[in-house]
Each structure stands twice: as structure tokens, then as C-alpha cells.
Amino acid sequence: MGGEEEVVSVELPAPSSWKKLFYPNKVGSVKKTEVVFVAPTGEEISNRKQLEQYLKSHPGNPAIAEFDWTTSGTPRRSARISEKTKATPSPDKEPPKKRGRTKSPVSKKDAEGEKSEGGGEENSHVKDTEMNPPEGIAENENVTDKNGSGETERVNDAKENIVAEETPNAAPVQEEGESMKEKALDSVDDKSKETDKEKDTGSIEKNSVDVEKKTVEASDEKKNSEAETRNHEENGLTTEAEGKEKTAEGEATG
């Protein structure tokens, strides 16, 4: 009654020269099923890490994607998809083209062309008016021709007035130029006056210096004259003293 339960294994399809064994676990174990791959060398591999290490150390074996760890005979869908992607090279996909705008922006050249066309229309309109004057002016000319030479003078005067109104008056421009010249001359005169004033002030300063020198010289002369007079006075006093001494000596001897 207490004998060990026999371990039953089921062989499933596996890669070439490999075996895939399915072992139902004992009752009470964590995993319900267990798959083991048996290598051509007889080594049993029970997890993916062992399989990776074995394939690295033993080159020439099938790819790791061919090993199915499920209990079914066919590999998993992800493995099959990965094999297909590896087998068939992916064609170069062109990037999706961006949708073009419905309204293309107007380029600068087109805008310039429209402007030039608009300017040409205006110029042509002006030329037409010059070639074909308004009806009122044409009627006046016809009337003057019918009335005679007196009326032609009036028409000519009217034309001159129109031309005078159309042509800009050049007088203000000339007046502005003359006013600018006058301002420039005034500024030159002011500068010359300032230089003359500076010269005058310089000459005045020189004169004041000369006057000061003269006053100093005069004071020096006065001092010299006073010193001379003092010397003369001292000499006179000494002569008087000498005379008094001589008279005193003469009286003493007599």
C-alpha cells in the first residue's frame, strides 16, 4: 500500500536531435505540470536559463525560439511570429506622406506679379486719360474753335491753369534752400564774433598783466628811493656827530 508512485512521462514534439518530456507533478506540488528538454548529450534542462547557457556553450543547436515550454505540441504564437519575422526580411516601408493643404499659400512672386499687373492697369488708365481727355474739356475746345480766336485764348489760359495746378510749386523749395543758407551764414558770423570776443578778452588780460608789472616796478623804485634817502640822512647825522666830536676835542686841547 505504501509503495512509491511511478513517474509517468509523455514525449512531445521537439526540435531536431532534442527530446521534450512532459512530467505531471505529484499531488500537492506548486507546479501542476513540468516540461523537460533532453539535449543530444543526454543533459536534462528544466528551465529557460539553463537552456540559454547550454545553447551558448554548445553552438550549432536550434534557436531558443524553437523551444516551446508549454504542454502543446506546437510552439507558442509569439515564438512562431518571431520566427516569421526573422525569416522574412521586412520591406522598406515608406513614411506616410503628409496631407497637403487645400489652399496653397500665395508665393511672393505671384503677389509681386499681381501688384505689377495692378500698376500696369493704373498706368494704362492714366495714358488713356491723357490721350482721351474728358468730355467737358473736349467740348470746350470744340466750342472755342467755332467761336474764333478770342475763345482760343481762354482755352489756353484754362490749360495753363490746369498745368500749374498739376505741377508742384518749386518756390517753397527755393525758399527753404535760401533760409538754410542764411542760417549757415548766421552761424558762421556768430562763431567769428565769439572768436573776436576771445581775442579781445585775451588782449585785456595781457594789458592787465602789463599794468601789474608796471605797478610792481614803480613800487620797487619807490622803495629804492626811500632807502637812498635814509642812507643820506644817516650820512648827514654821522657827519654832524663827527663835527661835534672835533669841536669838542679842539676845545679840550685849547
Swiss-Prot record:
Pfam families: MBD (PF01429)
S-S bonds: none
PROSITE patterns: MBD
Tissue expr: Expressed in leaves (around hydathodes), buds, flowers (carpels and pollen grains), stems (around nodes), siliques, mature seeds and roots.
Residue numbers of Phosphoserine PTMs: 116
Region (Disordered): 56-254
Disruption phenotype: Variety of phenotypic effects, including aerial rosettes, serrated leaves, abnormal position of flowers, fertility problems and late flowering.
GO cellular component, one term: nucleus
Domain MBD residues, every copy: 4-74
Compartments reported by the entry: Nucleus
Annotated PANTHER family: METHYL-CPG BINDING DOMAIN CONTAINING PROTEIN, EXPRESSED, METHYL-CPG-BINDING DOMAIN-CONTAINING PROTEIN 11
Biological role: Transcriptional regulator that binds DNA independently of its methylation status. Required during plant organogenesis and development.
Entry note about domains: The methyl-CpG-binding domain (MBD) functions both in binding to methylated DNA and in protein interactions.
Protein name: Methyl-CpG-binding domain-containing protein 11
Species name: Arabidopsis thaliana (Mouse-ear cress)
